[in-house]
Structures are given as structure tokens and as C-alpha cells.
């Protein structure tokens, strides 16, 4: 009985996998073309969560001018790496101006992000290169978005911003199109693979 269920699971996974293959490819290309932002609040208090957003704005403002004319994510990552001391200083100045004694630690890393919905687009779950900003003890809620392309501040210019940064029309469509179905397929495909390959006789 268990083997029969595994056969059914295999067939289901195969069919879903064929459908998902193109979406998986788009998702991988999308992750490779973005530099994400992850800001972690010191705590979940109202004050710490409010200043977290001020720090976010200070971080993005410190990078905006240099990122504006870049058209390649690798160049953006290199630029942000060189700017880390300035980013950290800007964030710490923001905290001090708001009357906080906490300090900020910034780093470039790779992190797992959940699926996130924004005003004009959505991003699939996965591992992304990211600028990580931790305030104080870093025990508060997170704020996730994108450093490059500057999508989180693009507003109505979202499509143009994505295009200038080198995202193809297909990938831009992945962000703003039928993303709920596409990302649902990705998540179910991952669950099916884990369930099948982790099962035993």
C-alpha cells in the first residue's frame, strides 16, 4: 500500500514538475538578478519597530545615488560591499538622532527569504544575496525588500526600474503578473519533492 502511494506521489510530482520547470527557471534567474534587503529590529516594541523603518530609509538613501546608474547586479553587490562602512555609519547616525543607544551591524550575506507581496510586485521564496542590517540585539520583526534594482522605492516606475537594471520583460512579468499561481506552484513543487525523496519504504 505504501509503495502504491509512493508511485502515485511520483507521478503527481512528475506532472507538477513538468508544469513547474519553466517557473523554477524564471525563479532562479530572478533570485540571481536581485540584491535583497533584510532589516531586523532590535525588538518588537512600537518604538523599536518605528525606528527600524527610519534606519531602512537611511540605509537606502546612503546607497541610492551610487546604485542609480548601475545596470548589473554583480556591480551593485560590489558597490554595496565597498559602501558597507558608510551604510553602517548612516544607520548609526539615524539611531543616534532618534535618541537610541543601540548600534547597527551590516553585512552582505546569502539568506532564505519568504514569499513577499509588495504594492506593485511579489517575490518568490528562496535564497538571495542580501544586505543584512541588524539593529541592537536583532530580536524584533523583519523588514524585507530589494536594494537592487531599487524596486521598493520605484512606485509607478517599477517596470522601468526593473528594465534598466537588466531584468528581462519575462522576469518583470513574473514579478507583476500571475505571481500568486506561479509561486504557489513553486512552493507545492518543493513540498512534493521533499515528501517523496524523504519518505522511506
Feature annotation, model-predicted:
Residues 6-23:
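Hydrophobic membrane-insertion alpha-helices, especially the h-region
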Residues 28-39:
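Alpha-helical transmembrane signal-anchor/signal-peptide segments
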Residues 38-46, 71-82, 134:
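Second-shell loop/turn segments in exported
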Residues 38-69:
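Short extracytoplasmic
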Residues 56, 60-68, 85, 89-96, ...:
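Sec-exported extracytoplasmic/periplasmic mature domains
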Residues 77-146:
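Mid-length scaffold segments of soluble, non-membrane domains
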Residues 120-179:
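Soluble extracytoplasmic domains of inner/organellar membrane proteins
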Residues 164-201:
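C-terminal partner/receptor-binding element of secreted or periplasmic proteins
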Amino acid at each position: 500500500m505504501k509503495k502504491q502511494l509512493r508511485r502515485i506521489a511520483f507521478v503527481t510530482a512528475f506532472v507538477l514538475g513538468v508544469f513547474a520547470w519553466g517557473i523554477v527557471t524564471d525563479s532562479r534567474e530572478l533570485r540571481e538578478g536581485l540584491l535583497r534587503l533584510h532589516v531586523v529590529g532590535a525588538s518588537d516594541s512600537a518604538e523599536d519597530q518605528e525606528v527600524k523603518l527610519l534606519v531602512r530609509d537611511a540605509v537606502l538613501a546612503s546607497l541610492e545615488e551610487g546604485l542609480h546608474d548601475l545596470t548589473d547586479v554583480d556591480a551593485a553587490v560590489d558597490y554595496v560591499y565597498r559602501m558597507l562602512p558608510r551604510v553602517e555609519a548612516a544607520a548609526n547616525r539615524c539611531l543616534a538622532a532618534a535618541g537610541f543607544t543601540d548600534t547597527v551591524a551590516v553585512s552582505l550575506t546569502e539568506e532564505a527569504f519568504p514569499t513577499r507581496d509588495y504594492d506593485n510586485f511579489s517575490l518568490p521564496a528562496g535564497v538571495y544575496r542580501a544586505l543584512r542590517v541588524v539593529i541592537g540585539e536583532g530580536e524584533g520583526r523583519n523588514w524585507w525588500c530589494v536594494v537592487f534594482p531599487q524596486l521598493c522605492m520605484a512606485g509607478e516606475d517599477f517596470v522601468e526600474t526593473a528594465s534598466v537594471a537588466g531584468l528581462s520583460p519575462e522576469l518583470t512579468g513574473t514579478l507583476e503578473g500571475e505571481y500568486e499561481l506561479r509561486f504557489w506552484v513553486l512552493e507545492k513543487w518543493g513540498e512534493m519533492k521533499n515528501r517523496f525523496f524523504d519518505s522511506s519504504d
